A protein has these predicted regions:
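Long amphipathic alpha-helical segments used for membrane anchoring, targeting, substrate engagement
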Residues: 1-72
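Pan-zinc metallopeptidase signature
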Residues: 5, 242-288
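Active-site recognition of the HExxH zinc-binding catalytic motif
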Residues: 40, 98, 145, 168-181, ...
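Catalytic zinc-binding patch centered on the HExxH motif and its immediate surroundings
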Residues: 53, 120-146
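Short helix/loop segments within enzyme catalytic domains
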Residues: 81, 85-97, 101-103, 107, ...
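Catalytic Zn2+-binding segment of zinc metalloproteases
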Residues: 174-190, 210-217
Length: 288
């Protein structure tokens, strides 16, 4: 997905704490496997990411705040060249889209916070290492991303990658914020191919698609190409539960799914891309 080169970016929309150091305890998960696997493992043990993070103290943070965004992310041209600037542009586009959706219902969008970090970060849900990958903390209503996850998406999960694949990940996490505002984030936690946890994640995929299908109308982006859509669908499939289980365990167990299969994730991303309203993403009452 290509940004209009002349569009203005607001780097202040994203908090950049890369280069800070987090001291003390908190969640420290090894392996650099990304939040999808972490969530799957936690759910298998009877909890979820919020339960684990929420039970840990927030760790103090030291060091200077990164200034790269302020200095170098000024326009859509920068977003087309730099990964962090692309994140800024994607968030601004998502803000416009979801503001309009809420306004159409007479509501005002409460925008999520967005923080870029490296190595570790302190949140209201506790502290986490970069191994957790992208995640949303409902307690501070903030999306946290270590940009290194996008490299993991290609090298560890086997995705093709690409700008729209990266923005799919960001818009999925933004979708969790929308679910939180609508009271849907905790609608279901049971695992399995048709369980509540899977339905929650598929809805976030669908919300990502709703934005993607209408993103050009936000004024930040050029129309999607077939290649860009294919990259996002490839990323969605790469992080399907069946693909991850096959890669990690050598076998597939649908009863343990928490995010949906490759096919399910692609299907609901497509439903969003081709849809026009929140009703098109009602995974809790649909045959998934």
């Amino acid at each position: 997905m290509t940004f209009r080169p002349d569009v203005d970016l607001d780097p202040g929309r994203v908090r950049d704490v890369r280069g800070r150091r987090v001291r003390g305890g908190g969640l420290a998960v090894g392996g650099g496997v990304g939040t999808l696997i972490i969530v799957a493992l936690i759910l298998l043990s009877g909890g979820d990411l919020g339960d684990i993070l929420g039970g840990l103290p927030a760790a103090p943070v030291e060091g200077p705040v990164g200034s790269q965004l302020v200095n170098e992310c000024e326009s859509g041209a920068d977003a087309n060249q730099r990964q962090d600037c692309r994140l800024v542009g994607a968030v601004q586009s998502l803000d416009v889209y979801w503001t309009d959706v809420f306004a159409a219902s007479g509501e005002q969008l409460q925008k999520p916070g967005v923080t870029i970090f490296s190595d570790a970060v302190s949140t209201e849900c506790g502290s986490a290492t970069s191994a957790v990958g992208p995640f949303y903390c409902p307690l501070d209503q903030t999306i946290y991303l270590d940009l290194g996850f996008f490299n993991d998406l290609e090298t560890r999960f086997g995705a093709e990658g690409g700008p729209f694949a990266e923005m799919y990940v960001v818009s999925h996490e933004y979708g969790h914020h929308i679910q939180n505002l609508l009271g849907l984030l905790d609608a279901g936690r049971d695992t399995g191919a048709e369980g509540g946890a899977v339905r929650t994640e598929l809805q976030a995929d669908c919300f990502a698609g709703l934005w993607g299908g209408d993103a050009v109308e936000t004024g930040f982006l050029e129309p999607l190409t077939r290649e860009q859509v294919a990259q996002a669908l490839d990323a969605a499939a790469a992080i399907g539960d069946d693909r991850i289980q096959e890669r990690m365990q050598g076998q597939v167990d649908p009863h343990a799914w928490t995010h949906g299969s490759a096919e399910q994730r692609q299907e609901w991303l497509i439903n969003g891309l081709e849809g026009s309203s929140l009703a098109d993403c009602d995974t809790f009452n649909a045959d998934i």
